[in-house]
Swiss-Prot record:
Belongs to the bacterial/plant glucose-1-phosphate adenylyltransferase family. One of its GO terms (biological process) is glycogen biosynthetic process. This is Glucose-1-phosphate adenylyltransferase. It comes from the Bacteria. The gene is glgC. PANTHER family: GLUCOSE-1-PHOSPHATE ADENYLYLTRANSFERASE, GLUCOSE-1-PHOSPHATE ADENYLYLTRANSFERASE-RELATED. InterPro entries: ADP-Glc_PPase, ADP_Glu_pyroP_CS, GlgC_bac, GlmU/GlgC-like_hexapep, NTP_transferase_dom, Nucleotide-diphossugar_trans, Trimer_LpxA-like_sf. SUPFAM superfamilies: Nucleotide-diphospho-sugar transferases, Trimeric LpxA-like enzymes. CDD domains: ADP_Glucose_PP, LbH_G1P_AT_C. PROSITE patterns: ADP_GLC_PYROPHOSPH_2 (PS00809), ADP_GLC_PYROPHOSPH_3 (PS00810). It comes from Desulfitobacterium hafniense (strain DSM 10664 / DCB-2).
Amino acid sequence: MRKKECIAMLLAGGQGSRLGCLTRNIPKPAVSFAGKYRIIDFSLSNCSNSNIDTVGVLTQYKPFALNTYINMGSAWDLNCLNGGIHILPPFVGEAQGSWYKGTANAIYQNMDFINFYNPEYILILSGDHIYQMDYYEMLSCHKQKHAEVTLSAIAVPWEEASRFGVMVTDAGGRIIRFEEKPPRPESNLASMGVYIFNWDVLKEALLEDERDPQSDHDFGKNVLPRLLQQGRRLYSYLFHGYWRDVGTIESYYNANMEVLQEERVDKFFELKQRVFSNEEILAPQHLGERAKIHNSLIGNGCTILGEVRDSVIASGVYVGEGSLIEQSILLPNSEIYEDVRLHKTILGENAIVRAHCRIGDKREGNPPQEGITVIGDHLHIPEGTVISEGENVRKDTA
């Protein structure tokens, strides 16, 4: 038994079905973001920068790419001997074991791992948000208020509040009510999916939840409301920084485009600590004689022979002569051949678009700013193909 004050459990097994074909072969935390990162980089970097050196990463859906990317955790300085990073897939033991049935059940199935370190506090994280937070400051607040559970919270627009777990607090920040994704929210204070529990409180709550046959075994739906009913001390930790939930195609696209906006980019990059990634070491970008770049982010290892405008281009991408890329996101190692027009499109990893294609063509009658075209990873789009805006292409086109 190795005593740790606080360890982190990072939930990274979600399929991310709302991201469509972007998560056909990989889980949501492994999806590329802003040209050089994976979504999970932000939570792992937060742990490293907050001196939390023991992290359990709970994987489930198609985990190979994520496991390979994380490796031993050295990119985030989490390859230490006493602690470090641990990949925790579902397993079958003598008395228990199955696929994770919910966020709470995922932690329940790994109680032996937690008990090995015998922590006083447990930090529960989601691996699919873009933000930077000092978890140590949150833990200090948790201690000062003698809280049993602390939830990080952020004010969101009222029209978006129903997408989140929302809380009502008193003047001191103590949570009075909590409801997961209410149809008519009474607050716009949203849970960020970052929790600190006293381990003894969480252990008891998980055991009780597992005994309930009616439970969905979910923190937001079951565990937190039950703790409130029991009169436990739940507090909010108000976060004022940059935070984005990128769980839908629209939110993922918009968050990437924000990196290019002058009024947003300063806030995104005013990070107090570095965001680490396990990015492959590649040569610098190569720009051809006729290449034109305007307000775009170009990753390492790219070859750009055409024109790129208002776009995020990840590492290892090829754009051929005479091609025009506008308001698009090209994920790692994708290829665009000659004379291609790509508009407001997300092109998956290792996808290939042959010459003379027109992708994201405007449909008559659609309002402006609608219709993000998505091409799945490893797909081949034949020469001369026309794909209208808003289509979600999951398999090779004939």
